[in-house]
Amino acid sequence: MRIEVVNVSHIFHRGTPLEKKALENVSLVINEGECLLVAGNTGSGKSTLLQIVAGLIEPTSGDVLYDGERKKGYEIRRNIGIAFQYPEDQFFAERVFDEVAFAVKNFYPDRDPVPLVKKAMEFVGLDFDSFKDRVPFFLSGGEKRRVAIASVIVHEPDILILDEPLVGLDREGKTDLLRIVEKWKTLGKTVILISHDIETVINHVDRVVVLEKGKKVFDGTRMEFLEKYDPRFFTSKMLVMRRLVLKGEDPFSMSDDELLERVCNS
C-alpha cells in the first residue's frame, strides 16, 4: 500500500485557550515495502502524524490517500497496525491470547483466531504455549513490547507503525526488536518507525523524515540524513573514500548502501 500525506495540518483544542498547532502543511509519500524513520524532537508532531496515517485521528485539514484513495478509519485500521510507545496503553485483556486475538475477532469474526495468534506470537519470538495464558501487565518490558507488536500484526496488515519501540529496552532487547523489524521487511511490507535512538535504528531504515515544530524540514535517504545531521559521519565518509582510492577501489561506483556499510564498519 502506498500512502500519500498531502498538506496535512492538525490543531488540538481548536478555538479554545489550549489551542495547539501540532502539524503544519506536511506532505510526504510512504512507498510500499520501505522502512521509514520519522525523527524529531519531543513535541515536533511525530506521533500526531502517524496517528493520522493510522486513521486514529482526523486531520484538521489536508488529505491522506491510500493507493490513491481516501478511506475511512475502520478501513485504514484493517491494513495498518500501530504499536504505541508504552505497551500498557494498548493492553486491556487478562491473558496474552485474548490481547493478541482482539484484532482478528474485530476485523475477521468468522476466522479461527488460534492459528493466527500462534503465528503472530512466534513471529515476534514468543512461544505460544508458554505465553498464551500469562497476564500481559506482569511481563518484562521486552515481552510486553512483543505482545503489543503481535497484537497489531495478527490480522496481517500491510503496514506496521512502531512508536518509540526501543524505549526501556536493554541492548539485547533492542537487537531482538530490530530483528522483528527486519523480518517484517523481508515480507515486502512497510515499516514506519518513530525513534530518538537514531544511532541504533539508522542501519535498518531506507529513508528518514525529520519534523520540527510540526513542519517537515527534511526528507531523504539515510545517507543524505547522516551527511546533513551528523558531522562525524561526513568526516568518516571522506576517510573511508580516501582509503578505498588508495586501495585501488572506486568509491563513486558504489551504491549508497555499500558505501554506508563501509563507513559504519570503519
From Swiss-Prot:
It is an enzyme of class 7 (translocase). GO terms for cellular component: ATP-binding cassette (ABC) transporter complex; plasma membrane. GO terms for molecular function: ATP binding; ATP hydrolysis activity; ATPase-coupled transmembrane transporter activity; riboflavin transmembrane transporter activity. Keywords: ATP-binding, Cell inner membrane, Cell membrane, Membrane, Nucleotide-binding, Translocase, Transport. Its main location: membrane. SUPFAM superfamilies: P-loop containing nucleoside triphosphate hydrolases. Residues 220-266 are annotated as: Required for heterodimer formation. InterPro entries: AAA+_ATPase, ABC_transporter-like_ATP-bd, ABC_transporter-like_CS, ABC_transpr_CbiO/EcfA_su, ECF_ABC_transporter_ATP-bd, P-loop_NTPase. It is found in: Cell inner membrane. Residues 3-238 form the ABC transporter domain. One of its GO terms (biological process) is riboflavin transport. Its EC number is 7.-.-.-. It holds the Pfam family ABC_tran. ATP binds at residues 43-48. It is a peripheral membrane protein. PROSITE patterns: ABC_TRANSPORTER_1 (PS00211), ABC_TRANSPORTER_2 (PS50893). The active site is at 164 (proton acceptor). The keyword Mitochondrion does not apply. The keyword Translocase applies. Belongs to the ABC transporter superfamily. Energy-coupling factor EcfA family. Structure 4HLU is probably in the open state. ATP-binding (A) component of a common energy-coupling factor (ECF) ABC-transporter complex. Unlike classic ABC transporters this ECF transporter provides the energy necessary to transport a number of different substrates. Expression of the complex plus RibU in E.coli allows riboflavin uptake; uptake does not occur in the absence of RibU or the EcfA1A2T complex. PANTHER family: ENERGY-COUPLING FACTOR TRANSPORTER ATP-BINDING PROTEIN ECFA2, HEAVY METAL TRANSPORTER. Forms a heterodimer with EcfA1. Forms a stable energy-coupling factor (ECF) transporter complex composed of 2 membrane-embedded substrate-binding proteins (S component, RibU, BioY), 2 ATP-binding proteins (A component) and 2 transmembrane proteins (T component) upon coexpression in E.coli. Stable subcomplexes with both A plus T components can also be isolated. This complex interacts with at least 2 substrate-specific components, BioY and RibU. This is Energy-coupling factor transporter ATP-binding protein EcfA2. It comes from Thermotoga maritima (strain ATCC 43589 / DSM 3109 / JCM 10099 / NBRC 100826 / MSB8). The gene is ecfA2.
